[in-house]
Amino acid sequence: MTKYFTSESVSAGHPDKIADQIADAILDAVLAQDPNARAAIEVTTSTGDVSIFGELSTSAYVNVRQIATETIREIGYNHAELGFTADSVNVSNKIVEQSGDIAQAVDNADDDPEQLGAGDQGMVFGYATNETDSYLPLTLALSHRLMRKIRDVREAGIVGYLRPDAKAEVSVELDDQDHITRIAAVVLSTQHDENVSLEQLRKDVRELVIDQVLPQELVDDKTIYYINPSGRFVLGGPQADSGLTGRKIIVDTYGGAAHHGGGAFSGKDATKVDRSAAYFARYVAKNLVAAGVADKLELQIAYAIGVAQPVSLNIDTFGTAKIDEAKIRDITAELFDFRPLAIINQLNLRRPIYKQTAAFGHFGRTDIDLPWEALDRVDEIKARL
């Protein structure tokens, strides 16, 4: 039976990603002054408007409006015809202080007063696969690369009529062993100026973006290309669709290849296990796969609010384990400390490093240096096999 798998990505100019980048830009600015700040910032975008709200406890002062407008300008919304520009947008700031009840639960863990308790209950997942050098599913890796490439040709003026909003989707065909045999379909929709023909756009995007990214050994004469299949895409970004932080959590993580605990990343400081523990779970999963314990691996960690130690830890190798899964779990529990403060210290997460993750994925990044992508525990794992 023929099987298929698909992942998608969106550009930095997508309305939801604008919101994520503003939230993380504010977080970075706060952390640059106050590494111990607590933040849970949410952002909405719509035509001519950005609303910023959530909770923040910090000694830092940051100019929220300036950060928002600078972020919008960097993304490329700087022309009046886009209907949403850095110079004209209305920014409202409704941030309030974090609840004292939450703060006391985090500051003194119920099971260890010297540790930070988890900032909330919930579960997170980490995943890695040896399908690609980035340890991400190929479909997601290619979708992200398509979005970075179309940004690059737009910003370099190579295709000057492109606008910031875009989406990509890659589908692959799998054999009975779930190995990729070919790329079945590519979908790419991009915002554009009014005066370009659909024929010209499709030609340029195919030649200058798609053909530069796809591995040609996986492309054949049956590969289907859908480039702006809806036709006209002049109105885009927040002028056409509202945006909200945390609405692209599958794009941010594993493209649908793994489970997701439901918690978003952007705008949250590292005491929020939604973010920090998800990063650490990726770090652990990636090092385990790189050590050869399995071809792909998913790690689940669950927490209780105000408690440092995880409630549970589970590993699934999808039938690809090279050793017994129980041994993989024992090695994981022995080598890695999953308490929130330990995670923060191991990955040095009280730094302004988050805005760069808010577009093109939080994992598998080869264009930036992220601590949870380091393969620095492989030898320790191998020594215990």
From Swiss-Prot:
Residues that hold Mg(2+) according to the record: D16
Which parts of the sequence are annotated with region: Flexible loop? 98-108
The UniProt keyword set, sorted, is:
ATP-binding, Cytoplasm, Magnesium, Metal-binding, Nucleotide-binding, One-carbon metabolism, Potassium, Transferase
What cofactors are annotated for this protein?
Mg(2+); K(+)
Q: What is its EC number?
A: 2.5.1.6
Q: How is the cofactor bound?
A: Binds 2 divalent ions per subunit.
Name one matching Pfam family: S-AdoMet_synt_M
Ligand binding (ATP):
H14, D165, A166, K167, R232, F233, D241, R247, K248, A264, K268
Taking the first listed entry, what is the main subcellular location of this protein, grouped into a coarse class?
cytoplasm
Report the locations given in the UniProt record.
Cytoplasm
GO BP of this protein: one-carbon metabolic process; S-adenosylmethionine biosynthetic process
The protein's superkingdom reads: Bacteria
One GO molecular function term of this record is:
ATP binding
Question: Which PROSITE patterns does the UniProt entry name for this protein?
Answer: ADOMET_SYNTHASE_1, ADOMET_SYNTHASE_2
Q: Which Gene3D superfamilies match?
A: 3.30.300.10
Question: What the protein does?
Answer: Catalyzes the formation of S-adenosylmethionine (AdoMet) from methionine and ATP. The overall synthetic reaction is composed of two sequential steps, AdoMet formation and the subsequent tripolyphosphate hydrolysis which occurs prior to release of AdoMet from the enzyme.
- Which NCBIfam families does this entry report, sorted A to Z? metK (TIGR01034)
Question: What protein does this entry describe?
Answer: S-adenosylmethionine synthase
